[in-house]
Amino acid sequence: MIKREFLPESAELKIKLTADSKKWAEFYQKAEQKQAAKVSLRGFRKGKVPLEKARAYLNPQAVFELALRMFLPELEKQAATNIIDSDNVIESPIFNIVNMDKNNLEIEFLYPVYPEIKLPDYKNLKTKFAIKKITKEDIELQKQKLLEAKGRFIEVNRPVKIGDVINFNFKGFIDDEPFDGGEGENFDLRIGSNSFIAGFEEQLVGLEIKKEADIYVTFPENYQVHTYANKKARFRVKINKIKENQPAKLTNEFVASLKIQNVETISQLEVYLENLTERENIERAKIDFQKNALTEIGEQVEVPLAKKLINLEIERLNEVFHSTLKQQEIPLKEYLKITKFTEKDIYDQFEVEAKKLLKNSFIFAEIAKLEGLVPTQQEYESHVEKLAKFTGKSVQEISETVSYNEIQINITNQKVIDKLIEFNHETKDEEIVNKNQNDNEIEQDKEQKDNNEEKIKQENNLENK
């Protein structure tokens, strides 16, 4: 007997079946015989103990599990014949045992299906796509970053200022007790980089070399070591050295030394930096919009998630986590010691993140379905070429290592974001498109332009290292 039932609250199709009792009995007997072959009794050669005598030494649970393992592929195949296209099954099932004894087996298969989703009015979100307008101050800041990146650091004997790189010692206390990871010597820090928790670097400003001082901070609520979250701490600090940045001088010769195509004078550099800043602002606006738009939509919609999908996503996150630890050569035990986490804490975090990622993926998929957003072959090939260029691999290598579906999903998601921007923006459509174009782009090909911009970004990032 087979019974189908759709479970909308968990986005699953349940197919319950009663196995043929004769077949189940046969598999149970085979399992008994396999387990009996492992029994050793005095007077019998190994594997030759009669089943009647071996039964007394068998683990009934092990026999049932083996019998089920052998029978399961056939049962799953039988259940699958009762699936129709309109069920929208998207993954293989998990199963539950309803009833099982030596003579009878009832089992149910739970297939993840595409969930029922009722989206809010995503065409009129409160979240709007807005590009920050460029000011003269923005261009001056870009120039200053570039000059500082090309400058040099010299030791000075004066109080600490914003922008200095200091070498210092520190020791942290919580409730007047030292804590793990709260101590360091000869540590280099650029003041203003926000590398430490809020308030720490600001209190270093004004301190002098060789003098000790106390700094008081509060660990943030989301601090990675959760046992320190929201805790007040005192740091005893001592400045060893102070280095001041002496920026390079902005001249036409300096600009020429950057070797940026079609940029040889100060005025050309300013135009170039303006174009670069525009593109950065667009990218930043897209990132902010995507985050806030998904949050707004997500708060207004419930997306039922099948347990199998959640488990698979947790497994993926766990694999990424352990791979990262391995790359950084950090044993799991050491990580747990440093962060004060338990393995259950980590699993719980993965579960929350898995549900969030799955929910967002279905929101993307539903909007794509409603708007008819389907990647073209040209978009696929262009995406593969970009991945190849970014990773330094060939197009063929990318095609072989990154699945077709994964690339299609990435393209579709970007099309969804573009469509949401089209619906929810504070800038005219043509302005959004034209922001990506400028005089320099017309004069130089796309590849060279990207290389130039990456060069500028790298120069600007040097100062933060």
Curated annotation (Swiss-Prot):
GO terms for molecular function: peptidyl-prolyl cis-trans isomerase activity. It comes from the Bacteria. Residues 431-465 are annotated as: Disordered. GO terms for biological process: cell division; protein folding; protein transport. Keywords: Cell cycle, Cell division, Chaperone, Cytoplasm, Isomerase, Rotamase. Its EC number is 5.2.1.8. Residues 443-465 have a biased composition (Basic and acidic residues). InterPro entries: PPIase_dom_sf, PPIase_FKBP_dom, Trig_fac, Trigger_fac_C, Trigger_fac_C_sf, Trigger_fac_ribosome-bd_bac, Trigger_fac_ribosome-bd_sf, Trigger_fact/SurA_dom_sf. One of its GO terms (cellular component) is cytoplasm. The keyword Isomerase applies. It is an enzyme of class 5 (isomerase). Pfam families: FKBP_C, Trigger_C, Trigger_N. It is found in: Cytoplasm. Residues 163-248 form the PPIase FKBP-type domain. It catalyses: [protein]-peptidylproline (omega=180) = [protein]-peptidylproline (omega=0). Consists of 3 domains; the N-terminus binds the ribosome, the middle domain has PPIase activity, while the C-terminus has intrinsic chaperone activity on its own. NCBIfam families: tig (TIGR00115). Involved in protein export. Acts as a chaperone by maintaining the newly synthesized protein in an open conformation. Functions as a peptidyl-prolyl cis-trans isomerase. Belongs to the FKBP-type PPIase family. Tig subfamily. HAMAP family: Trigger_factor_Tig. This is Trigger factor.
